[in-house]
Amino acid sequence: MEEEDITLEHSDDLNKEESGESNRVNIEEPEHHDNSNKESTNLDDLNMLEEPKYHDNSNKESTNLDDLNMLEEPEHHDNSKKESTNLDDSNMLEEPKHHDNSNKESTNLDDLNMSEEPKHHDSSNKESTNLDNSNMDESENQKNFKIEEPKPSGDFRNEGPKQCDDSKIEKPELHVNSKIEEPIHRIDSEHNEPEYHTESKNEESEHNTKSIREEPIHHVDSKNEEPVYSKIPEKMGDEFSENSLSKSDSAVKQEGNLLIHPNNSLKDTAPSKCKEPPVDEALSKKEISDDIAQITSVTPITEKIEDKDKYISEVIDTYGKLADGFEYRAKTFCLEGRGKVLYMLGTECSRLLGFKDSYFMFHKTPSLRKVLTTQSERDQMVEMGLLASNFRFRQLSIVPARQMFLAFGARILMKGTIDPESHKALIEKNISWADDEYYHMDVMANGSTRSSSVKLELKSMDNQNSPSPFQGKDILTLAQGASFYNSKVMRTRNLRKEARLSYYTKLRGVNRSVS
């Protein structure tokens, strides 16, 4: 009985230990199963069975490691998880290439590292293809063991402490880090197409495309521009020929199918537009000098003007009278005291020529002489029927007919024509006014001016009696007179009030005495 009790107690202790350890395993199992489920989607059946063994060993090793080792190991497992979940089936096939690079690097390591690397490859899923036959046999035994017992058994517990030595744990971590960092550098240098550097790939591709696009354009410009600018001669003559430009055009046509010019053709560029016809070879310096002499040997301008003066004198005389066959559009008249000179109304001329008012006509054509009329002259025009009676007392200006003819030419004529060149020559010669001999009369009488913008030389007779503008003294005198008037009015009012009062007081006194 005692032996049975001892065996029961021993079995109970074992069950407690197993239950305690199973609890530990159960606590760790969810992480183990979750990781296996994530990786099972992309791995084959062989890899599915090998993964739990690696994770079980890591869980047992983590129990004996310090807190730092506990924090470092999950980083290694997280990297494997991220890589397994993000890679497609095609990437799964390419992974052995990555491990081949790591195997090449492992040859340069020490013998100790070489002996320890297979252990790491036994636990990893990606390096199982490169193991020896002995490792393959162990993996098959582990597969069978896992198929029979999916849950971890006591064998895993016994294997765990053997692999938990510090020397065996720290060194693989260093090799794992070197394997993670160095292949990335080699992948960038060899393939230039890693998933980690997508931005650099795009930048390189854009840079390559830009260089490919820019180079042909640069070559086309250099090929096409050189013949155009270099072959244009400095001196125009026998050396010039269109062959230099035709060669460049033909070069563009031949290369047009392969290369594209930015302007599509050289005809649109500036050099092609600068083409000039070749100079005739027959011409020489002597012939050119002879032509220049013929051009310069022309009758002088003075001779032409004299001829034109004769021609103009046949059309109009100094008083403004036209020859036979010519007629003014405006009415002309003569005034007493002004001789035989013909005059026109400024308002009528401005209306016929299209000006808004006579003021604008005189302002735009300062060569015209504006003559101001007197009251007697206005009365004469009213009697002749040239002016309405209501304009008799208004200011009016008249213009000599010859000046209107010289200023406007055929525009002021109703009949007859005249050569415009001769008309311009007369103006350039500064022919004297048509009525110079009567000009002193206008100055003395009315103070006529050549234009409205010029000041009056003398005051007209109408303006002699006009009052002068107000000044400061005049304003003071007006103010003093107003104050004197107001004081005088107030005095008269006060006298009237006093007279009323005295009158009423006298009436009251009389009435009282009577009563």
Swiss-Prot record:
Mind listing the UniProt keywords for this protein, alphabetically?
Activator, Chromatin regulator, Nucleus, Transcription, Transcription regulation
* One Gene Ontology CC term in the entry: chromatin
The yes or no answer to whether the keyword Nucleotide-binding is present is no
Question: Does this UniProt record's set of keywords contain Transcription regulation?
Answer: yes
**Main localization category:** nucleus
Question: Which residue ranges have biased composition labelled Polar residues?
Answer: 126-136
Record field: compositional bias (Basic and acidic residues): 7-37, 50-59, 73-85, 94-103, 116-125, 140-226
| The family this protein is said to belong to | Belongs to the RSC7/SWP82 family. SWP82 subfamily.
Tell me the protein's name.
Answer: SWI/SNF global transcription activator complex subunit snf59
- Tell me the organism's taxonomic lineage: Eukaryota, Fungi, Dikarya, Ascomycota, Taphrinomycotina
Q: Which gene encodes it?
A: snf59
